Amino acid sequence: MKKSKYVLLALLVSLGLFSCKKDFVPTDSATVNMNGEWWVAIFVDDSIMIADYSDIGGSIITTNTAANTSSTMMIDDQNNIWPFKVQVPVDYPNLTFSASTGHLNLADSVNTIDVIDGSRIIKDGATSPSLHTTDSIVLKMEFSDDPGTIYWFKGYKDTGWPEDRWD
């Protein structure tokens, strides 16, 4: 009986020690307000839709880089569209993608991508199919394997609601 009291006491002490562990609080990335999963339609020269959300069957991801700076981001279509994956400069306070040229397409390591002026994220600028207010994105890009054609990727940020997803 005495032994079981000591075992019970040891168990209670160990539970007390481990229950005092603080909860993990993750830190935000340097580009947290621009990060996300985006459902986009694709236009040529802002007027001709060449692919709707349902045609693509996937999303674009914007995320910070390993350097975690507020001046550079990754844009990745997850092989759903072109395919492309590119690191681009951003103006984080204004939520814009800086106009810049010659970014290596990391998806194929051959072609380059130009980001055209006017690419941006608009806070609460869209209404999703489930009628939730969410951010919108406009990306204007030119690909070196299709020179002279400006592709506009326009859409909304994923809300987490199943009816807003197109995959």
Give a label for each model feature:
Residues 27-167:
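First exposed extracellular module after export/assembly in secreted or surface-exposed proteins
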Residues 4, 21-25:
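Regulatory, intrinsically disordered low-complexity regions in eukaryotic nuclear proteins
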Residues 1-7:
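Bacterial N-terminal signal peptides that target proteins for export
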Residues 16-19:
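C-terminal motif of bacterial Sec signal peptides marking the signal peptidase cleavage site
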